[in-house]
UniProtKB/Swiss-Prot annotation:
Pfam families: Lactamase_B (PF00753), Lactamase_B_2 (PF12706). Gene3D superfamilies: Ribonuclease Z/Hydroxyacylglutathione hydrolase-like (3.60.15.10). It comes from Bacillus thuringiensis (strain Al Hakam). This is Ribonuclease Z. The active site is at residue 67. The keyword Hydrolase applies. CDD domains: RNaseZ_ZiPD-like_MBL-fold. PANTHER family: ZINC PHOSPHODIESTERASE ELAC PROTEIN 1. The lineage of its organism: Bacteria, Bacillati, Bacillota, Bacilli, Bacillales. The keyword Zinc applies.
Amino acid sequence: MEFVFLGTGAGVPSKGRNVSAIALQLLEERGQTWLFDCGEATQHQILHTSVRPRRIEKIFITHLHGDHIFGLPGLLGSRSFQGGTTPLTVYGPKGIKQFIEVALSVSTTHVKYPLEIVEITEEGTVFEDNEFHVETKRLSHGIECFGYRIIEKDIQGALLVDKLLEMGVKPGPLFKRLKDGEVVELENGTILNGNDFIGPPQKGRVITILGDTRYCEASRELAQDADVLVHEATFAAEDEQQAYDYFHSTSKQAASIALQANAKRLILTHISSRYQGDTYKELLKEARELFSNTEIATDLKSFPVDR
């Protein structure tokens, strides 16, 4: 599991930062990539990374401001043009379906893969399978905006091979049956319960990715005990009133949410273009004064998510 930040700016592109898009690489977990937001030129940013459009399985849109969605039509079309055939699902607020369908229709763009568009109308679970569970809550922004909590389900423990070998069980079909939790009888009459030969499960990771938002309770709830919290930090602490007026957060407010939620790690993104050069490091300094395990994303930077 690895983050690749494709765009980390706020509102409009700048020389140093493109607009919002985050790839969550799940190559080891499911051989796929999930994308969170898709601002203008996202597909161009992808060219500079290891992200492959054909592997993008899901796109989660936080809200419908242009800096979070204007890259969608181009990416969807290019994925088809480049030979993508596997299904893709886009999740987002009401209106995302109309935006995509009109853009593709007017431009006579035809995708050759199954494209499903899911409009989120209620908080709660938006996706679940045997590996992941994705929940959402409304945030506090000028328009409807969602944050996402991605919960990796616990992974079954490893088969205790050494313990089986000590009992004279040889590698082969019995190993698989025991791994599946079956009760088996050996040739000498010994009964073995597979559950007795499985190590402790690996606890799944929790990732929280928030859209644009003021400081709010929903952010804390989504981030509770997260292994990684990705939070916007559009403004410095001294501009807290301006952040409130424009429905955004400061770096210190992001750190406060991480602290209250008992998150393990905080990554700041959505940085205003007013912070050019190294001036953005002041945002990082402010956040670390409150929550030490804070990092700040820059375009094309990767962050592995360890267990």
